């Protein structure tokens, strides 16, 4: 294969596409590079399996630790279970790619993206998304592309394409835009309460760069003599669908217009119609085509019935502006909330209901030592102080399934809800706790991730976390029939399943904190996306008002079972003194007081205890140890050693000075032991600190007021 190397520049940063050199047996392969980050993306296909009614697309993203010059930990020294970032990147590649394959395609397709080199500036995820499109084109698969993705950052007042890690961290926006020639196809964003118009402009800015990358892909395949594969869909025999339309259209319409039915009732009635159709088909003569079709393939009837139902529901929304539950296009389902739904052993809890969707969130407050360390990870990132985990048990949709580890969907939904709250989590110097929120989906009928955002907000406030502002979220949908477009507010399950878009928007009353948009069509113009973003705001504010009617401010007090934290700074040079040889000193403090102590490299000490008084005791011990002594200071100390020329007195844990025999009393002392014994409590004054740092103490010339103040201070230590 001919080797081609094509480069395109954004804001002085090049993206290079190299084809024809790597993975010659893959259907298509490209090395996509920027800076020292390089990702190999391959696309391979195999003949489809019998009896499946979906596109078997498998997307895997992997990172090799040698890409960052690292050797894996553990006994085997091999990459182990992939970190969460790998799962999220796999989803990021899959989401814009899947809608661009024909809906009728049934071939097995596997995309493998592997980061082979990585610097500390360029994230590999958006490179992998663009690379997946190139690989598919080279594999000559049916594809409505090309497709590309870029990241948009906000530095000052300027948008930039593909910002570095540092620029993303220091900015107010982290937005990924993916698009096709037909328009924007995916959006993923975290933002620091940015106004809607800023987000819209950022998406538009990003799509312009996407178009440049699409053109670069077109030039590559043109140079290689490859044409876009756009096959005609296989002919579908309309006989069965026509039979269903003739026999059941009016019945289905009647069910779809019974607005008082809930999800389960509607599903049951539709199933009854389908079962009745199945029974009527079995009564047809054997030579009838409809009967022969259904008997030859069991899934045909169900698929055809879904197709007819989908078309009728969409027609109802477009023509009448009324949804299956009777709502208008911009109407939110009934919302109700509660807080403190679990006993106070759980540090904070809430229950959020929107229609038949119900999410319970539980909040746990931990110490800085509970922060999540991202081990064996290539990505430069601080420890995570805020963690959100999302669980979706089978009973939430009335199903029975084995319970497994969280899948890609659960990890993705948890990350989205986490991202929505991060901008309002208080800084560690204000609230030093590590926070974990677990959202349990107890009932699902659409938009559980946004339900998790709302439940998390209320749970945090119930736990007494002083969040900057409360956050709410809503999921927007879309029905597109030819040139007719209808945007739906707060979509439920059937609208998500039968619609064309799932657009989740979360934020405060000041602006957006998170976005996630996925399509089932091949792209949308920015104008439609802008309308959806603007339509989401009144829905978010309506939901927020309902939440604040239950709890409008964070509780002033935390659960009595939450750990009490005291945080203060010491001189970093004193850290070794506090820890002691082999950890002896700090271990002694923890054993004496029963607290947990964390010390950061910058000298920040955080003490956690169930008993606030114990935390204060440990705090006073450490502050005393690290306090610098000054001449003239008076302390209550304890005699630790006696030598012929004087006595050593410990004024703080680990800090002592010597009282010379001449400074013990205002008269001549023959032997130190005549005046002092080991363990005696004495009042001493710092006389001097010599050039070697040795502390000389005295018992002379101490005013009674100084002695009284020293005794008062000693009671606090």
From Swiss-Prot:
Using the record, list the residue span of the signal peptide; answer none if the entry has no such feature. none
Primary location class: cytoplasm
HAMAP family assigned to the protein according to its UniProt record, in alphabetical order: PNPase (MF_01595)
Matching CDD domains, A to Z? KH-I_PNPase, RNase_PH_PNPase_1, RNase_PH_PNPase_2, S1_PNPase
Keywords, comma-separated and alphabetical: Cytoplasm, Magnesium, Metal-binding, Nucleotidyltransferase, RNA-binding, Transferase
InterPro entries per UniProt: ExoRNase_PH_dom1, ExoRNase_PH_dom2, ExoRNase_PH_dom2_sf, KH_dom, KH_dom_type_1, KH_dom_type_1_sf, NA-bd_OB-fold, PNPase
- Where does this one sit in the cell? Cytoplasm
PANTHER family hit by this protein: POLYRIBONUCLEOTIDE NUCLEOTIDYLTRANSFERASE, POLYRIBONUCLEOTIDE NUCLEOTIDYLTRANSFERASE 1, MITOCHONDRIAL
Please verify whether the record's keywords include Amino-acid biosynthesis: no
Q: Which GO terms describe its cellular component?
A: cytosol
**What is the catalytic activity of this protein?**
RNA(n+1) + phosphate = RNA(n) + a ribonucleoside 5'-diphosphate
Q: What class of enzyme is it?
A: transferase
The text of the family note is: Belongs to the polyribonucleotide nucleotidyltransferase family.
User: What is the stated purpose of this protein?
Assistant: Involved in mRNA degradation. Catalyzes the phosphorolysis of single-stranded polyribonucleotides processively in the 3'- to 5'-direction.
- Name the Enzyme Commission number(s) assigned to this protein: 2.7.7.8
* Domain KH stretches: 563-622
Query: What is this protein identified as?
Result: Polyribonucleotide nucleotidyltransferase
Q: Which GO terms describe its biological process?
A: mRNA catabolic process; RNA processing
- Entries under Gene3D superfamilies matching the protein: GHMP Kinase, N-terminal domain (3.30.230.70), K Homology domain, type 1 (3.30.1370.10), Nucleic acid-binding proteins (2.40.50.140)
Keyword Transmembrane helix, does the record have it?
no
State the Pfam families in the record.
KH_1, PNPase, RNase_PH, RNase_PH_C, S1
Q: Please list the cofactors this protein needs.
A: Mg(2+)
Source organism of this protein record: Trichodesmium erythraeum (strain IMS101)
């Amino acid at each position: 294969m001919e080797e081609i190397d094509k480069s395109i520049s954004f804001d002085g940063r090049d993206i290079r596409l190299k084809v024809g050199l790597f993975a010659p047996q893959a259907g298509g392969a490209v090395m996509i590079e920027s800076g020292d980050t390089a990702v190999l993306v391959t696309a391979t296909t195999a003949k489809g399996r019998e009896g499946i009614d979906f596109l078997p697309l498998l997307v895997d993203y992997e990172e090799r630790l040698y890409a960052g010059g690292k050797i894996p930990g553990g006994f085997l020294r091999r990459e182990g279970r992939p970190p969460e970032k790998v799962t999220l990147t796999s989803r990021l590649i899959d989401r814009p790619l899947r809608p661009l394959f024909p809906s009728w395609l049934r071939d097995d397709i596997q995309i493998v993206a592997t980061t082979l080199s990585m610097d500390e500036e360029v994230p590999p995820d958006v490179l992998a998304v663009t690379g997946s499109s190139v690989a598919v084109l080279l594999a000559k698969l049916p594809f409505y592309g090309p497709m590309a993705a870029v990241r948009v950052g906000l530095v000052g007042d300027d948008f930039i394409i593909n910002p570095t890690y540092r620029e993303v961290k220091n900015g107010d926006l982290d937005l990924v835009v993916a698009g096709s020639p037909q328009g924007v196809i995916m959006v993923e964003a975290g933002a620091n309460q940015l106004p809607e118009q800023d987000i819209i402009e950022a998406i538009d800015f990003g799509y312009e760069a996407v178009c440049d990358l699409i053109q670069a892909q077109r030039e590559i395949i043109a140079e290689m003599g490859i044409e876009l594969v756009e096959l005609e869909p296989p002919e579908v025999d309309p006989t069965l669908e026509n039979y269903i339309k003739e026999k059941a259209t009016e019945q289905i319409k009647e069910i779809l217009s019974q607005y008082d039915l809930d999800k389960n009732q509607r599903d049951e009635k539709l199933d009854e119609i389908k079962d009745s159709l199945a029974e009527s088909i079995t009564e047809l003569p054997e030579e009838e085509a409809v009967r022969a079709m259904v008997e030859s393939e069991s899934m045909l009837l169900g698929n055809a019935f879904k197709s007819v139902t989908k078309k009728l529901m969409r027609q109802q929304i477009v023509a009448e502006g009324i949804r299956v539950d009777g709502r208008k296009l911009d109407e939110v389902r009934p919302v109700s909330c509660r807080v403190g739904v679990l006993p106070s052993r759980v540090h904070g809890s809430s229950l959020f209901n929107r229609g038949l969707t119900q999410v319970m969130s539980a909040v746990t407050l931990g110490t800085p030592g509970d922060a999540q360390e991202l081990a064996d990870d290539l990505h430069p990132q601080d420890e995570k102080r805020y963690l959100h985990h999302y669980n979706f048990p089978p009973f939430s949709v009335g199903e029975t399934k084995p319970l497994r580890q969280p899948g890609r969907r659960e990890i993705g939904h948890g990350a989205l809800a986490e991202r929505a709250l991060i901008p309002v989590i208080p800084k560690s110097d204000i609230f030093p706790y590590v926070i974990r929120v677990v959202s349990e989906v107890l009932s699902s009928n659409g938009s559980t991730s946004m339900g998790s955002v709302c439940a998390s907000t209320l749970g945090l406030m119930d736990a007494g976390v002083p969040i900057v502002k409360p956050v709410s979220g809503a999921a927007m949908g879309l029905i597109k029939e030819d040139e007719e477009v209808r945007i739906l507010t707060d979509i439920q399950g059937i609208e998500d399943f039968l619609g064309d878009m799932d657009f989740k928007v979360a934020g405060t009353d000041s602006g957006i904190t998170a976005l996630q948009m996925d399509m089932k069509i091949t792209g949308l113009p920015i104008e439609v996306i802008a309308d959806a973003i603007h339509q989401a705001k009144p829905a978010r504010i309506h939901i927020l008002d309902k939440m604040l009617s239950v709890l409008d401010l964070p509780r002033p007090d935390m659960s009595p079972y939450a750990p009490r934290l005291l945080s203060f700074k010491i001189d970093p040079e004193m850290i070794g003194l506090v820890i002691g040889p082999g950890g002896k000193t700090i271990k002694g403090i923890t054993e004496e007081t029963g607290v947990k102590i964390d010390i950061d490299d910058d000298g920040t000490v955080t003490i956690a205890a169930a008993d606030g008084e114990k935390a204060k005791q440990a705090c006073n011990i450490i502050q005393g140890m690290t306090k610098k002594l000054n001449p003239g200071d008076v302390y209550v100390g304890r005699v630790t050693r006696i030598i012929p020329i004087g006595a050593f007195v410990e004024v703080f844990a680990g800090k002592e000075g010597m009282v010379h025999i001449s400074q013990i009393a205002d008269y001549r002392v023959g032997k130190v032991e005549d005046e002092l014994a080991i363990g005696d409590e004495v009042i001493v004054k710092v006389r001097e600190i010599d050039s070697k740092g040795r502390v000389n103490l005295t018992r002379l010339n101490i005013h009674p007021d100084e002695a009284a103040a020293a005794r008062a201070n000693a009671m606090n230590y």
